[in-house]
Every structure is written in C-alpha cells, then in structure tokens.
Amino acid sequence: MTTKEFAKILQDNLTSEYGVDLSVASHQQIYRALALICRQMMSENHKKFQSKAIGTGSKQVYYLCMEFLMGRSLKMSLFNLGLNDAAQKALAEADISLDSIYEEEPDAGLGNGGLGRLAACYLDGMATTSICGTGYSILY
C-alpha cells in the first residue's frame, strides 16, 4: 500500500469516526483510527485464512490460559500488515510522529507474569507458522 493510499484510508476513518481532519485530530483519535484500520485488515485476513483452513480440513488449536501478556499491539500490527512505513510517512507529512501515537495505546493488562508472556509467544508462534488457533482466557 502506498503512502497516499494509506493517508486516504486514515483520513476516511478520521472523518467517519470523529468528523475531523488529520491536521486537527488528537493523538488519541489518530491512534483509534489506526487501530480500526488494523482491525479491518486483520479481520479480512482472518476471514480468508479461516475459509482456507475449513476448506482444507485443517485442525485447530484451542489454547486455554489464565493470562496472556500481549503488551501493546498497534506497532506490531502495523509492522505485520506491512503498513509501518506507509503510516510513518503519512503521519510525517502532517508533522506527526508515529512514536507519539504509539504512546496513546494502553497496556492490555491481561496478566503480569512469565506464563502470560509465554502464552503470548505461543499465540505469536501459531500466527507466524500459519497454525489455525485461538487463545481463550477469563476476564478477572
């Protein structure tokens, strides 16, 4: 995706969600618009992957853990979707630092221990190796 295409998608999200232009949007609004872009693209990718997995009869892993220490996800999501450079350049044109937008993201707070980080690594590993899997936990 080019910087221009990404800038248009970002502006469209800011307009539809908040009714603002990138030049006057708050960092929180930009963060949420970027997160929405990532969610939309990941949902499309997930839908395609699930369809392929079901079509080929792949088995699925269901991982149950008390906690998942995922940390912040926007930076990694943009990177994994191949959007990091486009996002950085689109924001730089508006004199906004992508790093300052990353700071808007709260920590998921889904645990605080080594097992939570290990569980997150298992999920990352499944995603990286294209293993169809889902992590389940409780909200406490």
What positions do the PLM features span?
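A conserved ligand/cofactor-binding region detector
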Residues: M1-Y140
